[in-house]
């Protein structure tokens, strides 16, 4: 093990004692926000300290087995123990490296997924519907709940724009991530190549959608919106093709005047619920704008493999004639497109997470 990594790990036992003491204090227990924060850190530190203790134990086992080699009667058993210990030590070191990677505090949060039809007209809107269905199906496979926050339907099906809220327990995504941590690398441009249902000559068309994944702010993170900065419009909710689905102005559009960011909702039964949902999405969009601006600055300094998550980044191609999905950021190609569109997205999400981990390990000099 590299000395840098070992020195980092040595601190965890001491930090665990400090956290145990803090959690026993009455003033900490009385402050729920601080107590939750310390409890979260305690769980993370306990995991690292436990795995490092196991690593040290196996190091001691290995040293003992090597001493046993000098005894002819014990040599065979010693060789078996050496092989087992060396194998486990490699696995433990890899696990410890990943546990020490910087954590995105938003990874455990629920997420909003915003899908917009781009170039390609009706076919793009249909593909936006396919993407919404893919994420909804994937969410169902891991036990997450999906709620449509707003939807602007196309006349022939699909969506011009749709916003989904996905809720799930922390640690239920690939590699133990939460909802946002699992889906955040979906942000960017998604291109589809296929023969549209309306195409009579059998020609392949190319169209595109953009996806933005935003963490849902919790009550402590949520920004305070000044009512003076908001313009709230109400209008009649309508379905595809402009058919009115009610006769009251229950749909709500909220404009954040300083940034020009807009959110609207017309899916709820009342103006009150639509306004609440629109404000939720608006807050997430404002925070995402700030986050993406920070990420763009960081990306200018460090060209990351996964990218900044900007909408303009073309990240993936879905080629239906070939049954192929290609993620251009990590040169991943899978020939199981129909299964992926039915929600079998885990392999793609995990590959992206592993690529990001490899980037971080390289930055820390651990690879």
From Swiss-Prot:
Modified residues (N5-methylglutamine): 243
GO MF entries: translation release factor activity, codon specific
GO cellular component: cytoplasm
Modifications made to the protein after synthesis: Methylated by PrmC. Methylation increases the termination efficiency of RF1.
UniProt keyword terms in alphabetical order: Cytoplasm, Methylation, Protein biosynthesis
Organism: Acidovorax ebreus (strain TPSY) (Diaphorobacter sp. (strain TPSY))
InterPro entries documented for this protein: PCRF (IPR005139), Pep_chain_release_fac_I (IPR000352), Pep_chain_release_fac_I_sf (IPR045853), Prokaryotic/Mito_RF (IPR050057), RF-1 (IPR004373)
Entry keyword annotation includes Translocase: no
The protein's name in its UniProt record: Peptide chain release factor 1
PROSITE patterns: RF_PROK_I (PS00745)
Function description: Peptide chain release factor 1 directs the termination of translation in response to the peptide chain termination codons UAG and UAA.
Gene3D superfamilies hit by this protein: 3.30.160.20, 3.30.70.1660, 6.10.140.1950
Subcellular location: Cytoplasm
Primary localization class, coarse: cytoplasm
Signal peptide: none
Family the entry assigns: Belongs to the prokaryotic/mitochondrial release factor family.
């Amino acid at each position: 093990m590299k000395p840098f990594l070992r020195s980092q790990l040595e601190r965890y036992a001491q930090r665990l004692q400090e956290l145990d003491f803090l959690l026993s204090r009455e003033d900490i227990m009385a402050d729920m926000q601080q107590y939750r924060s310390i409890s979260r850190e305690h769980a993370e530190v306990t995991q690292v300290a436990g795995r490092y203790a196991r690593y040290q134990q196996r190091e001691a086992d290995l040293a003992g087995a090597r001493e046993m080699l000098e005894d002819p009667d014990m040599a065979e058993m010693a060789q078996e123990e050496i092989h087992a210990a060396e194998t486990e030590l490699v696995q433990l070191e890899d696990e410890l490296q990943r546990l020490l990677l910087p954590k995105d505090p938003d990874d455990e949060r629920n997420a909003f997924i915003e899908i917009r039809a781009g170039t390609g007209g009706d076919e793009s809107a249909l593909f936006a519907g396919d993407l919404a269905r893919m994420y909804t199906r994937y969410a169902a496979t891991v036990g997450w709940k999906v709620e449509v926050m707003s939807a602007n339907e196309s006349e022939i099906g699909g969506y011009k724009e749709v916003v989904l809220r996905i809720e799930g327990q922390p640690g239920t995504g690939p590699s133990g991530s939460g909802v946002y941590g699992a889906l955040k690398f979906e942000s960017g441009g998604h291109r589809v190549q296929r023969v549209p249902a309306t195409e009579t000559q059998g020609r392949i068309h190319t169209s595109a959608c953009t996806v933005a994944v935003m963490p849902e702010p919790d009550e402590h993170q949520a920004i305070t919106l000044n009512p003076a900065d908001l313009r709230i419009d109400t209008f009649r909710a309508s379905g595809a093709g402009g058919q009115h689905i009610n006769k009251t102005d229950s749909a709500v559009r909220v404009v954040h005047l300083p940034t020009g960011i807009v959110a609207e909702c017309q899916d709820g039964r009342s103006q009150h619920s639509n306004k609440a949902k629109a404000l939720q999405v608006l807050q997430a969009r404002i925070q995402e704008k700030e986050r993406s601006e920070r990420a763009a600055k960081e990306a200018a300094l460090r060209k990351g493999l996964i990218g900044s998550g900007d909408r303009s980044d073309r990240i993936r191609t879905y080629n239906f004639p070939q049954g192929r999905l290609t993620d251009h950021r990590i040169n991943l190609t899978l020939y199981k497109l129909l299964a992926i569109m039915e929600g079998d997205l885990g392999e793609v999400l995990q590959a992206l997470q592993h690529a990001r981990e490899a980037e971080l390990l390289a930055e820390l000099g651990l690879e």
